Amino acid sequence: MGGGVGMDEAGETLAGFVAARMGEAVLERSVRPIIAGIYTADPSVLATDTVAPGLRAETARHGSLAAAVAVRLAAAGSRRTPEACVQGGMFVLVDALKAAIEEAGGTVLTRTGAFSLRRAASGWTLECGPTKPGPTPGAEPVPAGPGVNVTTERLVLACSASAALRLLTQARIPGLVPDVSVPEGAPIARLTLAVHAPELDDAPVSQGLLVAPAPADERPVAAKALSHLNIKWPWLADQLPPHTHLLRLSYGRLGEAEPAVTIDGALRDIRTLTGVTIAAEAVTDRLLARWNGTLPPLPPEYRARVRALEEQVRPLGGVALTGAWVAGTGIASVVTHARAGAKGLL
């Protein structure tokens, strides 16, 4: 098979690319279940270059999708392990970044949002002010007080699509037309349970598992994924009493109603997926978080509109866009894109 297979229009979607390179069996039995569980979308509507930036080019260079993936895995293997995590939780990373910025002479304003944006004589002026949380973790914060103006020569809009597009529209920049409509993402719910269950000490499903999509009346469970968090993140095990485990169940699929999540239903799903029966009284704590719309399916035409917007913004000077809505989902994609954008402003 030549390196050019899957590089045409059909390969712009992840499903088309995988099917062209490896066939329908690999798509149906491996890629589709994984993508549905992680991205809450079908690979037939996701842009290959957004989900896996650079993979098509690497496939063409190596002449094989398997070879391109192997090269990526080999490169990643030298700097990560299956247990890679931030010991203590992600807030530790945020605190470290804040400390590094302040040590370098910068200022970090927390619980502060950007209300408006306009051009200034020597850069950009943001109206910033206090905010309070929105209705869900993924929603924009809500203004909670008067704003103040902050002027800067260089500005990186590292935020959600809705916030960035709102600010760019308010700026009323001649020739700038933010013609980007973000597709609606699935309603996602994540229920984390702390349970006393010695039967889970042997980690019957290791770090966790994904549930392949199926018609609602054919699904063995309502959950789309289960993560055994104290196995996935070993530092958590040191924080828990003996025989206590943290299990996270994910619910919600694209095109379906907001999932109704209950403790009894979650325990039934756990029994089906792990073979372990956990009584309701063995649940010692719980946390339900909803992330509605935070994982929109990004098709090839969306990627084209975002690239067009970036081309409109670039000549303005002193401003860059980044975030998952521009760079693609995943920390690695966003970090690489954000670094390039910030470097371009120096």
Model feature map: region roles:
Residues 226-346:
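Conserved flavin/dinucleotide-binding core of flavoenzymes
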Residues 115-132, 136-260:
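Mid-domain catalytic core of redox enzymes
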Residues 101-107, 121, 315-318:
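A short helix-to-beta-strand connector/capping loop
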Residues 2-115:
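Active-site/ligand-binding neighborhood in enzyme catalytic cores
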Residues 22-31, 176-181, 276-285:
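Short, surface-exposed acidic
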Residues 90, 94, 164, 259-267:
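Generic alpha-helical secondary structure
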Residues 108-110, 157, 321:
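A structural signal for the hydrophobic beta-strands that form the central parallel beta-sheet
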